[in-house]
Amino acid sequence: MRIVIFGTGQIYCQQRKYLEPDKEIVVFIDNDSAKWNTYLDGVKIVSPKDVCGLEYDYIILMSMYAHEMKLQLYALGIPQEKII
């Protein structure tokens, strides 16, 4: 399963050990522009706008601002069923 992780902060760092090994992280997205074009765990971090056009199964929200992130993704045209 190909996933996108939205959020690269403390919640991701605490939860990454629980990601199942069959999950392939395609890319990280984050609203912090200082993190864009850097890497976390060997995976590139990009702007949320860059997720459009990528092939993935789900976007997993890993932030205390999950509700706001979900609204942001809806505004980008991401369907609700793709967001966890």
Go through the PLM ranges and name each one:
Residues 4-8, 24-25, 38-40, 64:
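A short linear-motif detector with a strong N-terminal bias
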Residues 15-16, 23, 58, 63:
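Functionally constrained cores in energy, signaling, and assembly domains
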